[in-house]
Amino acid sequence: KITVMATGGCEAVYRQTTNPLVATGDGIAMVYRAKGIVKDMEFIQFHPTALYHPGDRPSYLITEAMRGYGGILKTKDGKEFMHKYDPRLSLAPRDIVARAIDNEMKHRGDDHVYLDVTHKDPEETKRHFPNIYEKCLSLGIDITKDYIPVAPAAHYLCGGILVDLNAASSIHRLYAVGECSCTGLHGGNRLASNSLIEAVVYADAAAKHSLAHFEEYSYKDEVPEWNDDGTKMNEEMVLISQDAKEVQQIMSTYVGIVRTNLRLKRAWNRLDLLSEETECFCFLAGHESFAAAEGAIKIALNANKVRVKPLRVILNGLGKDAAMIISRINGFTYVQTEFDPY
């Protein structure tokens, strides 16, 4: 009677991501193909400091708290650079830092920068960041003595399946919660540590709304058989895996942190060719990736500028609904409301 999408984001369509590799936008792609409303797919947030270690997917997250602790971003030759981009230096918000790192890497031809905490007390560093210390040490990096190689990575999708305050999508009896949904609460740039709003608060809203209307719905008498006419099984899966890698390469190169119409059009043309090659295959592993990437590029091409709206501004625009959202959020006492730099 009720279907709830909780399929996560689509960051695995990028070469570097902090998300699980199953985050290929499956649920969003299903709704997109079913003509449901998908919104703000261009609002993909990049975390500025993922551990740079070629071959690691997903990338290991180096928390922003390390910069709050006093970590300093430096180029590969050991020079600080954040003073060129923001007076807050390495303490600037994640979107500014991610763009700054991306710019430095492109101008210098580097594949990463460094985060330096070697000037901090070694024992204090180990105490505050034991997991990061152990992870880096396993790769031969002692963060109390060595710089940490970092690079931006796709981290969170602020867009997705458009839902209302009950987490209901534009398709009847279909709800979406968590990262696959687009609530509008995050605007175009989610703040740290508050993704639980969509995962918990909206899941609660979906449960209550669906239970209230459950008896009104009836089951379908029959589910039609899957129609695979005109498709075929690909006997060489290496071709599919290669296509998936091409999608990641295209998205990372042309639809990354900094975008232009020229880059987006190139990405569109290349993905269009790949889509034609793979459209005929049944049970295609990477089919969702194409749909998710296609949706992101389509919307980005139509967006003249990023519509970044802080939570406060969005709530003001919602009027009487704002109080309802705030009361729902406040009802979950374990949702973190303050950022602890340590």
What is each of the regions a protein language model found here?
Residues 30, 36-148, 200, 209-218, ...:
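An anion/pyrophosphate-binding glycine-rich loop and adjacent beta-alpha core
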Residues 9-11, 43-52, 180-182, 224-227:
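Acidic, glycine-rich active-site loops and adjacent beta-strand->loop/helix elements
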